[in-house]
Swiss-Prot record:
Example of a GO biological process term: fusion of virus membrane with host endosome membrane
InterPro entries attached to this UniProt entry: Capsid_hemagglutn, Hemagglutn_HA1_a/b_dom_sf, Hemagglutn_influenz_A, Hemagglutn_influenz_A/B
Lineage per the UniProt record: Viruses, Riboviria, Orthornavirae, Negarnaviricota, Polyploviricotina
Keyword Signal: yes
Signal peptide from the UniProt entry: 1-16
Record-annotated disulphide pairs: C26-C480, C64-C291, C76-C88, C109-C151, C295-C319, C487-C491
Subunit structure: Homotrimer of disulfide-linked HA1-HA2.
One function term, GO molecular function aspect: host cell surface receptor binding
Keyword Chloroplast applies: no
Protein name, per record: Hemagglutinin
Annotated compartments: Virion membrane; Host apical cell membrane
UniProt organism field: Influenza A virus (strain A/Turkey/Minnesota/833/1980 H4N2)
Cytoplasmic side: 549-564
Length: 564
């Protein structure tokens, strides 16, 4: 009978862990069935409710002509445009933020080279405009406006229209030319001039009489002197001769002097340089469309608010930083702990310590309760807003840390500068590696902060409720409180909004707590009672067995013999 009584008490204790009939209020946070994995400082895989992708991987298949002004070189590169090659007349007076050079651009005039090609290309691109100022040059006793069959314009022999090919006069004279131009303006001037390299000595004397010729161009701070390199070269457009083009910048107040006895390709004027303009050049086959974007790459325009992109390392304009990662996710919600599918609303209710609540859609944090009036769920907007306020602006702050006009253009070097090109590539690769690492670290820091903030707000809400209830309720250890007094919906609401008065319910709660705890058995007493029950049961069983043996012996039913 004692064993049966003890077993009943144990069953009663086990059932007391379920709903006892007292009001219960639980605290929890929002959850979704499938969250998003993000990286933090301490964990590579943390599931959060919501996250935002920071790396743009999509681009438009076209270049946007707005708001940046684009000029399409079409069949002309920017140097041919400055020289005035046939087919480049559409570039006269052109103005741009980005000059689009096409891979299909071709030379259409006398074959030439530019010893310092990339520097000239960069100066022209940065200038942002072909603003050519024609000048009068008084050349002495030479023939001007030379033409070539390699340079057709409207099927007629012509030449670069920004340059003047000087040859000997009809009287076979090419006297020394010495001409000075003073820059009296308030801007720097760019002069482009050239030296012709005939293919034979005969061609040299036929054109210039003097052999060898010489060209010297000087300013107050520089001098370039070139002697023609006479010799046959591979035939290009019917010519085995070549022209080498040079350039000279004349600052305000400076002057330029042309001195030659032959082979000079003279300028017809100068280009006005704009020191305030910061334009650039992009080599791509992507067509120009009608879209709007501030960022261009060699693969197309990017229209995004994301701070990073992994589309192309060559980018121009207000562009996201290029990183090597294909994805970086910024946590914009709390840690996600999906609700167990088998758990009902109550009965096996649990708070935030065990799992989140998928039904909590009006806020990030909230309450569930059960009392005599039924059950209910409500969001806690104050703690939700406190968390949102700290998380909102994270993306903007991240963009501010990385948002600058970022121009990364492809650089080219002459073959003799291969070591410089290798070094430049190494520097660029190192910079990209550094940016990629910094981006990943920055996002991980922000994600760690987001999760810490949201966890902190949950703990603050729990502590606020615990301080309100005090001994009027018991912490169940799973985010729930069992309340030891009658608590209707208005009472529950006072707990939620922070107006709960502990003293009003104190006496009732103390009485109910003692009554309930009088029949509750703690886990320590359970073990003692189990051992006592087992011992008593064994003792009773042994006593009954001995009593039966004694009774049987007395009646002669059992005989015991002892042999020595």
């Amino acid at each position: 009978m004692l064993s049966i009584t003890i077993l009943f008490l144990l069953i009663a204790e086990g059932s007391s862990q379920n709903y006892t009939g007292n009001p219960v209020i639980c605290l929890g946070h929002h959850a979704v069935p499938n969250g998003t994995m993000v990286k933090t400082l301490t964990d590579d895989q943390v599931e959060v409710v919501t996250a935002q992708e920071l790396v743009e991987s999509q681009h438009l298949p076209e270049l946007c002509p707005s708001p940046l002004r684009l000029v399409d070189g079409q069949t002309c590169d920017i140097v041919n445009g400055a020289l005035g090659s046939p087919g480049c007349d559409h570039l006269n007076g052109a103005e741009w933020d980005v000059f689009i050079e096409r891979p299909t651009a071709v030379d259409t005039c006398y074959p030439f080279d530019v010893p310092d090609y990339q520097s000239l290309r960069s100066i022209l691109a940065n200038n942002g405009k072909f603003e050519f100022i024609a000048e009068e040059f008084q050349w002495n006793t030479v023939k001007q406006n030379g033409k070539s069959g390699a340079c057709k314009r409207a099927n007629v022999n012509d030449f670069f229209n920004r340059l003047n090919w000087l040859t000997k006069s009809d009287g076979n004279a090419y006297p020394l030319q010495n001409l000075t131009k003073v820059n009296n303006g308030d801007y720097a001037r760019l002069y482009i001039w050239g030296v012709h390299h005939p293919s034979t000595d005969t061609e040299q004397t036929n054109l210039y009489e003097n052999n060898p010729g010489r060209v010297t161009v000087s300013t107050q701070t520089s001098q370039t002197s070139v002697v023609p390199n006479i010799g046959s070269r591979p035939w290009v457009r019917g010519q085995s001769g070549r022209i080498s083009f040079y350039w000279t910048i004349v600052e305000p107040g400076d002057l330029i002097v042309f001195n030659t006895i032959g082979n000079l390709i003279a300028p017809r004027g100068h280009y006005k340089l704009n020191s305030q303009k910061k334009s650039t050049i992009l080599n791509t086959a992507v067509p120009i469309g009608s879209c709007v974007s501030k960022c261009h790459t060699d693969r197309g325009s990017i229209s995004t608010t994301k701070p990073f992109q992994n589309i192309s390392r060559i980018s121009i304009g207000d562009c996201p930083k290029y990183v090597k990662q294909g994805s970086l996710k910024l946590a914009t919600g709390m840690r996600n702990i999906p609700e167990k599918a088998t758990r009902g609303l109550f009965g096996a209710i649990a708070g935030f310590i065990e799992n989140g609540w998928q039904g909590l859609i009006d806020g990030w944090y909230g309450f569930r309760h059960q009392n005599a009036e039924g059950t209910g769920t409500a969001a806690d907007l104050k703690s939700t807003q406190a968390a949102i306020d700290q998380i909102n602006g994270k993306l903007n702050r991240l963009i501010e840390k990385t948002n600058e006009k970022y121009h990364q253009i492809e650089k080219e070097f002459e073959q003799v500068e291969g070591r410089i090109q290798d070094l430049e590539k190494y520097v660029e690769d190192t910079k990209i590696d550094l940016w990629s690492y910094n981006a990943e670290l920055l996002v991980a820091l922000e994600n760690q902060h987001t999760i810490d903030v949201t966890d902190s707000e949950m703990n603050k809400l729990f502590e606020r409720v615990r301080r309100q209830l005090r001994e009027n309720a018991e912490d169940k250890g799973n985010g729930c409180f069992e309340i030891f007094h009658q608590c209707d919906n208005s009472c529950i609401e006072s707990i939620r909004n922070g107006t709960y008065d502990h003293d009003i319910y104190r006496d009732e709660a103390i009485n109910n707590r003692f009554q309930i705890q009088g029949v509750k058995l703690t886990q320590g007493y359970k073990d003692i009672i189990l051992w006592i029950s087992f011992s008593i049961s064994c003792f009773l069983l042994v006593a009954l067995l001995l009593a039966f043996i004694l009774w049987a012996c007395q009646n002669g039913n059992i005989r015991c013999q002892i042999c020595i």
